[in-house]
Amino acid sequence: MLVPIPALNDNYIWLYGRANLPIIVIDIPEFTPLLDYVQQHQLNVEALLLTHHHDDHTAGVSLFKQHFPNVKVFGPAETQAKGATEIVNMGILQTEHYHIHVLQTAGHTEQHVSYLVDGHLFCGDSLFSAGCGRVFTGNYQHMFDGLQRLKSLPDDTIVCPAHEYTLANLAFAKYILPENVAIQQHEQWVQKQRVTHQPSLPTTMGREKQINPFLIAQDMETFVAWRKAKDVF
């Protein structure tokens, strides 16, 4: 199963699990939507994975730990102050049932990580559909390198960003790449999804290579110019 639970204004809490196994939860901006879904569907939770320390990804950790005191909360060191109990390192994270690759995707924050499990990429605020996160650290090289790392994943990788930013990102992508037909076509599909309050996510790495300016950018100079332009778009 793969489920994006809407939270706050435009966040998603992602749930992933194989058939008849406990699920993993990725980021938790608030607790109640998660609890409601888990109780309604009678799910067991194996782990909570945090991508970075921002409140709109961690504000539900405290209540989560109260309700699920035996479930480990994984995250980079910067999330320890927000309630992470297990600090992740780059490489392999093994839970009871899941073999998870931890990927360094710093730039949005100093220690932002992404998680790859069974061909599903949970990338927090590093990679969005048709966009990427703001570079709050000022380290554009880290951000560019992290996105290149994600870009190297197979085209059929299922990409699960943490925010419903796709329409706004596509508007900028059209501005930067006005001749890109794939962007125009995908925008039409996303508009139909959003009119009926359906998510535009997940996406795929293959699609993002076609429509995402920050993956299309061939060099650091172009990436930085486009990212700074998006900041004020």
UniProtKB/Swiss-Prot annotation:
Annotated binding of Zn(2+) 2, by residue: D56, H57, D125, H163
Disulphide linkage map: none
Reactions catalysed according to its record: an S-(2-hydroxyacyl)glutathione + H2O = a 2-hydroxy carboxylate + glutathione + H(+)
Cofactor(s) required for function per UniProt: Zn(2+)
EC number per UniProt: 3.1.2.6
Biological or metabolic pathway of the protein: Secondary metabolite metabolism; methylglyoxal degradation; (R)-lactate from methylglyoxal: step 2/2
Pfam name, any one: Lactamase_B
TM stretches of this protein: none
Cofactor: binding comment: Binds 2 Zn(2+) ions per subunit.
Binding site for Zn(2+) 1: H52, H54, H108, D125
Complexes and interactors: Monomer.
Main function: Thiolesterase that catalyzes the hydrolysis of S-D-lactoyl-glutathione to form glutathione and D-lactic acid.
Protein name stated in the entry: Hydroxyacylglutathione hydrolase
Organism listed in the record: Pasteurella multocida (strain Pm70)
